[in-house]
């Protein structure tokens, strides 16, 4: 273990490594938008998503209050990268224009991905993503003082997965040795390696974490 001295630095971004999420949402004209992001984390059956408030995804979530969180595997990096520097907003917001963004109406076509109908929300899922979570917006929290960023608190209504990532012999568990999420760290794509050390925390049965949002999700009818 390196016990060297720390040095104070001021990175422009603090993206130390989180899963990439392809957020699908519904545009005002009823078409589907698809946008990659990685400022996301989960607490039980809820997720917190950090988005620029002027982005098309944020505007769609604010208007419709629903979306899908599609989690790509590491093998899907080329498809995700085809969405880089694209926006569903037309005209392109000034801040994105300065960074080289351009408008694309058909994000699924641009990425070469397949939309499939969702169970409980209007936006489609991404067929190729091993994990998809249909969500509704429960709360929106401002971040910072300039109003440019918001944190969406979303509640999961359905979790849908490919059989390839389910743990054998179980109904409701993901196999972490089979699931290989695409990770973004400081704007670059990475995957996960093998487990590096046995986990004491993993001795706790997952069923002990099941909260009331799961029962609530069961009562949501299919659309």
Task: Describe the function of each predicted region.
Residues 1-223:
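Basic, polyanion-binding surface patches
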């Amino acid at each position: 273990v390196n016990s060297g001295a720390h040095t104070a630095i001021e990175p422009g971004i603090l993206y130390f490594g989180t899963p990439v999420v392809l957020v699908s949402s519904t545009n005002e004209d009823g078409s589907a938008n698809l946008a990659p992001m990685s400022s996301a984390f989960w607490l039980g059956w809820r997720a917190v998503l950090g988005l620029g408030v002027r982005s098309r995804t944020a505007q769609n979530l604010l208007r419709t209050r629903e979306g899908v969180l599609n989690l790509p595997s590491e093998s899907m990096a080329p498809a995700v990268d085809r969405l880089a520097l694209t926006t569903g907003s037309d005209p392109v917001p000034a801040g994105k224009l300065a960074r080289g963004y351009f408008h694309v109406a058909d994000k699924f076509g641009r990425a070469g991905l397949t939309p499939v109908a969702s169970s409980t929300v209007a936006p489609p899922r991404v067929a190729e993503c091993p994990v998809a979570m249909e969500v509704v917006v429960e709360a929106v929290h401002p971040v910072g003082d300039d109003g440019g960023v918001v944190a969406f608190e979303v509640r999961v209504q359905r979790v849908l997965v490919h059989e390839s990532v389910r743990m054998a012999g179980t109904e409701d568990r993901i196999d972490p040795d089979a699931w290989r999420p695409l990770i973004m760290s400081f704007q670059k794509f990475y995957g996960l390696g093998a487990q590096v050390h046995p986990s004491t925390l993993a001795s706790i049965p997952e069923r002990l974490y099941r909260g009331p949002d799961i029962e609530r999700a069961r009562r949501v009818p299919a659309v």
